[in-house]
Amino acid sequence: MSTSKLVEIPEPLAASYARAFGEEGQAWIAALPALVEELLDRWELTADGASASGEASLVLPVLRTDGTRAVLKLQLPREETSAAITGLRTWNGHGVVRLLDHDPRSSTMLLERLDASRTLASVEDDDAAMGVLAGLLARLVSVPAPRGLRGLGDIAGAMLEEVPRAVAALADPADRRLLNDWASAVAELVGEPGDRMLHWDLHYGNVLAAEREPWLAIDPEPLAGDPGFDLWPALDSRWDDIVAQRDVVRVVRRRFDLLTEVLGLDRARAAGWTYGRLLQNALWDIEDGSAALDPAAVTLAQALRGH
């Protein structure tokens, strides 16, 4: 099968790259078939199915010469991609997908193949699913961050500098007060940002069924920081479902209790850094033109307040 047949670029991925990176993104998309062909040859891989795409990457299932099933993951080289390679090399497969090889020039990763058809969201019992996620996260954040990884202290400091402009952009006085409250929580913690290696995006959809372990994490965007900053994606998992069940406060508090217990976190610090994630998300939304806080973020913050 020709490379051009294997590498069918999904239109949403091409459009996303054109929108985010302009001509650079379009050129990267156009060069993908040739890059895949080069890497298949260099690493002696055989394509084992059609390509698929994530939010920012193209994934191609392959076989190594010894029959090992793997995937090529290709995405535009950037800081987050380099951080992911650093994190995966440091974790070395402990609780996370294993990095088998990588190409420094293109930032392409050769990863062990997991079962992309079965995420942790398939586990209906929320306590069971959150227990799995908490166990994986505890393993990941037990590892000290290597030198050179982007740090939460710098990220949080930059966030605080943006707050006055962001507050002015909000239409509702209640939203302004809440954004300032989140910023105050971060300001109290920014002097001790932590030194653990964080995943940054560990939710149910980023945990896949595997062979060497029942479940493994995927798609890290590592940074050095306090594990409390890593809780929000887990708390937000299956959000529409828990809203539909009209049980948001109980589920959020139950998840928070489980996560902080398994990770051994100080609850006040964990809540403060979770407000930091809500602040980060809000700043991005406001930068994109929003004049109101996300109702889901407001609801989650209310569930944590006083708990």
UniProtKB/Swiss-Prot annotation:
The active site is at 201 (proton acceptor). GO terms for biological process: response to antibiotic; secondary metabolic process. Its EC number is 2.7.1.72. Keywords: Antibiotic resistance, ATP-binding, Kinase, Nucleotide-binding, Transferase. It catalyses: streptomycin + ATP = streptomycin 6-phosphate + ADP + H(+). InterPro entries: Kinase-like_dom_sf, NH2Glyco/OHUrea_AB-resist_kin. Streptomycin binds at residues 133-145. It comes from the Bacteria. GO terms for molecular function: aminoglycoside 6-kinase activity; ATP binding. The aminoglycoside phosphotransferases achieve inactivation of their antibiotic substrates by phosphorylation. Belongs to the aminoglycoside phosphotransferase family. This is Streptomycin 6-kinase. It comes from Streptomyces glaucescens. The gene is sph.
